């Protein structure tokens, strides 16, 4: 069978731990799903030494390039999902409530810090005012707080660089 070695982003240590807990609680043996805490250089070194039969990387373009370079010497197959930050589209025939719920959740999930997050939304002009009004109401209802508390909707940014990027986007 296949095994999984999860090396998560250094800013998201709890995510890997929670996934490991869930898989192990479901009966997956420890040696089949492993959560590892590695820096970028160590990760690249392990891939370069062909420690894995396949690498699936989700993250930045720079990180993806590093994984491809590390794997190139051993011809280890690599699949990458890079950059992220997808657009959302609201057509004239859309259900505005459903569009707001789906797109705002997609934008705000994980405080907007996921590579599949909705970064920009294009709304048909006939629905624009209603969409914006409902989106503002949706955002205002979010509870900011400690991410370890179950009633928190949005916690802090993972690092200073992410916070600066969001501030810049807001100021635009």
Roles of regions detected by a PLM:
Residues 2-98:
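Rossmann-like NAD(P) dinucleotide-binding subdomain of oxidoreductase/dehydrogenase enzymes
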Residues 54, 62-172:
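ALDH superfamily catalytic-core signature
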């Amino acid at each position: 069978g296949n095994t999984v070695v999860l090396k998560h982003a250094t800013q998201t240590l709890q995510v890997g731990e929670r996934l490991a807990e869930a898989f192990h609680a479901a009966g997956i043996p420890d040696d089949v799903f492993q959560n590892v805490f590695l820096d970028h250089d160590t990760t690249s070194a392990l891939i370069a030494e062909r420690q894995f039969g396949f690498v699936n990387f989700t993250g930045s373009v720079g990180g993806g390039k590093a994984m491809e370079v590390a794997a190139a010497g051993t011809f280890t197959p690599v699949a990458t999902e890079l950059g992220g930050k997808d657009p959302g589209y609201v057509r004239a025939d859309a259900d505005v409530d459903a569009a707001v719920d789906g797109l705002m959740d997609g934008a705000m999930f994980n405080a907007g810090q996921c590579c599949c997050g909705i970064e920009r939304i294009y709304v048909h002009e006939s629905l624009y005012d209603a969409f914006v009004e409902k989106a503002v109401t949706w955002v205002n209802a979010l509870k900011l707080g400690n991410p370890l508390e179950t009633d928190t909707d949005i916690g802090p940014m993972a690092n200073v660089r992410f916070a600066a990027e969001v501030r810049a986007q807001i100021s635009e």
